[in-house]
Amino acid sequence: MELEIALMLRPEAGALISGGKGLRKIRRPLSGRGKSGGARVIYYYISNNATIYLVFAYAKNRQPDLTKDQLATLTKFVASQIS
C-alpha cells in the first residue's frame, strides 16, 4: 500500500527508462535491505487521466536491470493496454 500512496502523491517520481516509451522505474526498499538493495518497480503513468499501471517488479539482487527483451515485452504490453 505504501507504493500506491507514494505514486498517487508523486506519479512522476520514477525515472524514465531509456527506450521504454514512457515506462518509469522506481526503487523501493525491501525489508532489511534499504533502497539500493531493494526492489525495482516498473510502471506507466498516463497524466491526462491520472492512471498508473504497475507492470513489473523485481529484486535488484536477482536482476540488476531489465533485459532488452523484457523492456521490449513490457513496452508492447503497455501499448496494447492503452490503445
For each feature predicted by the language model, list its residue ranges.
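Basic, Lys/Arg-enriched alpha-helical interface segments
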Residues: 1-35, 48-49, 59, 63-83
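Short, hydrophobic/aromatic-rich beta-strand segments within well-structured domains
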Residues: 38-47, 51-57
